[in-house]
């Protein structure tokens, strides 16, 4: 799975890499589910909540953060999104755990990359006039729509496979347009494990376990392995 990642690439570099205007973003060393994070869709970088809430959901509790590429078209939660609402999730590294030890996996030059994502727009139910309690999800009288996303996963490459049985779909730059705009069959053909030729992994501090920690020390190598 993909449950934590980093994105400390500058706004200008992200804009250059993805062909957008510079986003309003700050360096992130511990991106976690439930947070508002950058995604690329419609030619711009916006922020969406990590954890996909489908349009038909009654509430926004326990949203899935990952979607398996192999079954994504079969699951009601993901089927419409993968057909019509694909996105790129910028990152420059991600974390996986092995026997309690967290590792950061990245390219050896820390270059940014795109993980395959899907997104949704959910309208929270409104509270009916005159009722004293909120509707599902604890929403207010005039709730704002929630934009949310999930990261697509696939089998791991050799490097990640030493740590976990799944990994995020990392798209080659040549595949990004197909993922965003191509027929779903062609898009899913892009969802194999990314080669590990120039990827590296090193152990990091268990401070990354707590999503409240978010500073550069989290990506530093430790002596755990």
Where are the regions that the model predicts?
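Short linear sequence motif anchored by a di-proline
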Residues: 1-225
């Amino acid at each position: 799975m993909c449950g934590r990642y980093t994105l400390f690439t500058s706004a200008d570099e992200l804009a250059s890499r993805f062909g957008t205007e510079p986003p309003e973003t700050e360096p992130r060393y511990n991106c976690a589910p439930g947070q508002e994070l950058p995604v690329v869709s419609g030619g711009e970088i916006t922020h969406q909540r990590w954890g996909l809430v489908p349009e038909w959901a009654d509430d926004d509790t326990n949203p899935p953060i990952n979607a398996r590429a192999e079954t994504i078209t079969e699951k009601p939660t993901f089927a419409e999104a993968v057909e019509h609402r694909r996105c790129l999730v910028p990152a420059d590294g991600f974390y996986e755990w092995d026997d309690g030890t967290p590792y950061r996996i990245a390219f050896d030059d820390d270059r940014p990359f795109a993980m395959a994502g899907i997104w949704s727009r959910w309208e929270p139910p409104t509270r009916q006039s005159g009722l004293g309690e909120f509707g599902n999800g604890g929403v207010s009288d005039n709730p704002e729509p929630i934009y949310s996303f999930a990261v697509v996963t696939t089998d791991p490459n050799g490097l990640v496979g030493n740590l976990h049985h799944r990994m995020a779909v990392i798209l080659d730059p040549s595949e990004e347009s197909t993922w965003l705009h191509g027929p779903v069959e062609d898009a899913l053909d892009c969802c194999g494990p990314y080669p590990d030729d120039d990827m590296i992994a090193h152990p990091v501090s268990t401070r990354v376990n707590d999503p409240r920690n978010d500073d550069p020390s989290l990506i530093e190598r430790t002596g755990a392995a």
